[in-house]
């Protein structure tokens, strides 16, 4: 199973001057409410949103997605 690496996303976004969910939303076009749910760990992005994050910050998708054991994901 794969999950959004929230720590890495925050780090990369901050390095691009995006220190808030609002700023991430503006850069990526992902709805602000979705970004805040991702940052709180309440939701996971679908492939489309994950690709938007990667493209907006010019990074490999694997930088913001991490593999987690299936038991930990439940």
Regions found by a protein language model. Give the residues of each.
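Short alpha-helical DNA-recognition segment
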Residues: 17-37
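A short, Lys/Arg-rich alpha-helix, primarily the initiator
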Residues: 1-23, 62
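Residue-level signal for the short linker/turn that defines the boundary of a DNA-recognition helix
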Residues: 18-20, 45-48
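Short, charged recognition helix plus adjacent turn
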Residues: 1-3, 37, 55, 65-74
């Amino acid at each position: 199973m794969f999950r959004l690496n929230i720590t890495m996303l925050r780090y990369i976004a901050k390095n691009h001057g995006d220190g808030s969910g609002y700023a991430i939303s503006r850069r990526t076009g992902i709805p602000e409410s979705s970004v805040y749910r991702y940052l709180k760990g309440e939701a996971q992005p679908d492939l489309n949103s994950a690709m938007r994050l990667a493209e907006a910050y010019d990074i490999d998708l694997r930088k913001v997605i991490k593999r987690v054991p299936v038991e930990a994901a439940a």
